[in-house]
UniProtKB/Swiss-Prot annotation:
GO terms for biological process: adenylate cyclase-inhibiting G protein-coupled acetylcholine receptor signaling pathway; chemical synaptic transmission; G protein-coupled receptor signaling pathway, coupled to cyclic nucleotide second messenger; synaptic transmission, cholinergic. It comes from Caenorhabditis elegans. This is Probable muscarinic acetylcholine receptor gar-1. Residues 256-350, 381-403, 427-475, 515-585 are annotated as: Disordered. One of its GO terms (cellular component) is dendrite. InterPro entries: GPCR_Rhodpsn (IPR000276), GPCR_Rhodpsn_7TM (IPR017452), Musac_Ach_rcpt (IPR000995). Residues 42-66, 123-144, 211-633, 694-713 are cytoplasmic. Disulfide bonds join 99-180. It is a multi-pass membrane protein. Expressed in head region of the larva. In adults, expression is seen in the periventricularis magnocellularis (PVM) neuron.
Length: 713
């Protein structure tokens, strides 16, 4: 505020500048630019409030509009009139009335700016620290009343101090040349008291409120982070508890599996629960025979424990092996045969076929004897189409032809790849909790091309009356067992071989379509042995089945049938082959035995990913709450507004407080003038402070710079 008095002599109001014309031109250019920037910037703030609904609907933005109006007036009257006084050599050339009016406007608008900044700071503090109460109390009417009071109070104070000073004190206006100054500046104590009352007190209050806003924003951020940490800790504890339970369950399951493996005699067992389910699915009732096992201490690797007992152990092994092999072939064929269920008549015919098979085997003719297991059977074994059973009765030959026609179904590569070890069976193994105890018996057939003789001649050469008697004795028991394991059905089997062939063709088409759909979705990796010819490769006189590797580790159990000789003393006994001669089933290494290995690995990966999933929250930016956003917005606004205010206004009030005591002799005139211009620069910088602190004002300014002054609804 100017500290000058108006001279009473009108002659002293003439223009007499001590500065050169170029200096005056440069100064006027700078002042005009600053004045226009102040006017345009604050006018844009008022216009943004009118055209931007997001700004106008917030009641607190009215304080900003009030501050912009006061700064706008300062830009109109402050810069030009003070520049006239400075360039004229610190003399007022416009008269006494103009001097008093300019002093009144200048002091009033400066105090209005101070009080408005105080209102903005208090509004931001209450909205952050006492949100509920303040929002309930705040209303447009109350806000407008506070704004009016912020204008009326400075006008009343400085109207009395400027226009009524002479009436209050009885002193005439002091004249010192052409000086124009406020009359109360002549009393240093009143001058200092006024500056302390309306500036320094207000500045301290604003700093306290600013500190409160900063602390509130900090506390909200701490609370939000603590809440997020508690939430993450809760999620981690829940997931860890779940994973601990799963780990304990898997550990107990693994211990149970190890205990079951320790009880196995030959390395594989059959689970009766899964056996019953598979038999019911194939259309059979649960058999009453006991399970089969491989006895490593016996001369015969495949023995039968249960229903048949004979005096001769060697003949008993042959008979039981043939009966079990016949039952296995019959169940495998009928489970995929689209005809009626087996009947009692069929059982009798099967018993006759069994007798023929037993006789042919007793003669020393090697035959295919797939190992029987009432669990999940591996259907990958392919029956040799050239192997047929010759009998002396026409009915037996017809039955054998039907059985051989069904063997075509299993001789196809694609069909075997689908029927063997489907994923659905893997799921069933997990549901039955017996995946580790499931034995996959690889059935294989052997073809002898060297020294091949008719079976009838071999039977006549090696058959003995005692063996035939043993076969007849076992016939009744075998037929009875088959009848007990097959449900009664009055329908007769009238399916012809041609119909069976048609069904085989249709089944192949269905399986081919299923394979195409499955390959398009899963696309499993196939091993090098996936493409093999239908004809079997002969290595050491035995046929190796086709191996398909789809990339999964499947538990396997291999039983190798090795020909020890073609003499009648060793009629095709089976034994467990060494590791280098074993066949692999859907596995390249041939060492995996547990299906649970797959699920265990997947489960372990899921456990690790699920445990460390919440940690990813720390890697991305934390989402702020609504209260945090409000606090940070208020903090930014107050930082710019109060920061500009304190930096630009404090130098002048420091010098003005000292100025009254030393009469201007202790303060250089240049510093005093510069500090006064800094007060005006605060009005020029406030619009930029709004734009930097508030995104809504920034977007509105960009619209107006592009020439868009349309009101947004």
């Amino acid at each position: 505020m100017p500290n000058y008095t108006v001279p009473p002599d009108p002659a002293d109001t003439s223009w007499d500048s001590p500065y050169s014309i170029p200096v005056q031109i440069v100064v006027w250019i700078i002042i005009i630019v600053l004045s226009l920037e102040t006017i345009i910037g604050n006018a844009m703030v008022v216009m943004a409030y009118r055209i931007e609904r997001n700004i106008s609907k917030q009641v607190s933005n009215r304080y900003i509009v009030s501050l912009a109006i006061s700064d706008l007036i300062i830009g109109i009257e402050g810069f030009p009139f003070f520049t006239v006084y400075v360039l004229n050599g610190d003399r007022w050339p416009l008269g006494w009335v103009a001097c008093q009016t300019w002093l009144f406007l200048d002091y009033t608008l400066c105090l209005v700016s101070i009080l408005t900044v105080l209102l903005i700071t208090a509004d931001r503090y209450l909205s952050v620290c006492h949100t509920a109460k303040y929002l309930k109390w705040q209303s447009p009417t109350k806000t407008q009343l506070l704004i009016v009071m912020s204008w009326l109070l400075p006008a009343i104070i400085f109207g009395i101090m400027i226009y009524g000073w002479q009436a209050m004190t009885g002193q005439s206006t002091s004249m010192s040349g052409a000086e124009c100054s406020a009359p109360f500046l002549s009393n240093p104590y009143v001058n200092m008291g006024m500056y302390v009352a309306y500036y320094w007190t207000t500045l301290v209050a604003m700093l306290i409120l600013y500190k409160g806003i900063h602390q509130a924003a900090k506390n909200l951020e701490k609370k939000a982070k603590a809440k997020e940490r508690r939430h993450i800790a809760l999620i981690l504890s829940q997931r860890l508890g779940t994973q601990v339970g799963v780990s304990l369950m898997l550990q107990s399951k693994a211990e149970k599996e190890k205990a079951e493996e320790a009880q196995k005699d030959s390395g594989y067992t059959s689970n009766q629960a899964g056996d019953a389910n598979n038999l019911r699915r194939f259309g059979f009732s649960e058999p009453e025979t006991s399970q089969f096992r491989v006895d490593p201490n016996s001369n015969n690797n495949l023995n039968v424990e249960g229903s048949l007992n004979t005096e001769n152990d060697q003949n008993l092994g042959v008979i039981e092996e043939e009966r079990s092999g016949f039952l296995s072939r019959r169940e495998s064929n009928e489970s995929y045969y689209p005809g009626p269920h087996p009947t009692a008549a069929n059982s009798r015919r099967c018993s006759e076929m069994e007798k023929v098979s037993l006789l042919s085997e007793s003669d020393g003719v090697p035959s295919t004897r797939p190992a029987k297991s009432y669990g999940r059977l591996s259907l990958r074994s392919r029956y040799s189409a050239s192997e047929s059973i010759t009998t002396t009765h026409e009915n037996d030959e017809k039955e054998v032809e039907k059985a051989d026609s069904l063997q075509k179904l299993f001789a196809d590569d694609e069909l075997g790849s689908v029927l063997n070890f489907k994923e659905e069976k893997l799921k069933n193994t997990d549901s039955n909790n017996d995946s580790d105890t499931t034995s996959v018996i690889l059935q294989r057939s052997r073809k002898y091309k060297k020294n091949k003789r008719p079976r009838s001649s071999r039977r006549s050469e090696h058959s003995t009356p005692r063996q035939i008697a043993k076969v007849k004795q076992a016939e009744g028991t075998a037929a009875q067992l088959i009848e007990e394991s097959v449900p009664d059905d009055d329908q007769t089997e009238t399916i012809e071989v041609k119909r069976t062939d048609r069904w085989v063709v249709s089944m192949k088409k269905r399986i081919a379509r299923a394979l195409i759909r499955r390959r398009s979705t899963t696309r499993p990796e196939r091993g090098s042995s996936s493409n093999s010819d239908d004809s079997s490769s002969e290595v050491e006189g035995e046929e190796k089945p086709e191996v398909r590797n789809n990339g999964l580790k499947i538990p396997q159990l291999t039983v190798n049938n090795e020909n020890r000789g073609e003499t009648s003393s060793q009629p095709g006994r089976d034994r467990l082959a060494p590791p280098n001669k074993t066949d692999t089933f859907l596995s390249a290494s041939g060492v995996s035995r547990k299906i649970s290995t797959i699920s265990t690995v997947i489960t372990r990966e899921k456990v690790i990913s699920s445990i460390f999933a919440p940690i990813a929250v720390f890697n991305r930016g934390r989402k702020q709450t609504k209260a945090e956003k409000r606090a940070h917005k208020a903090f930014r606004t107050i930082t710019f507004i109060v920061g500009f205010f304190a930096i630009l206004w404090s130098p002048y009030y420091i010098m003005a407080t000292v100025y009254g005591f030393c009469k201007g002799e202790c303060i250089p005139s240049f510093l005093y003038t510069l500090s006064y211009y800094m007060c005006y620069l605060n009005s020029s910088g406030n619009p930029f402070a709004y734009a930097l602190a508030n995104r809504q004002f920034r977007s509105a300014f960009m619209r107006m710079f592009r020439g868009n002054f349309n009101k947004v609804a």
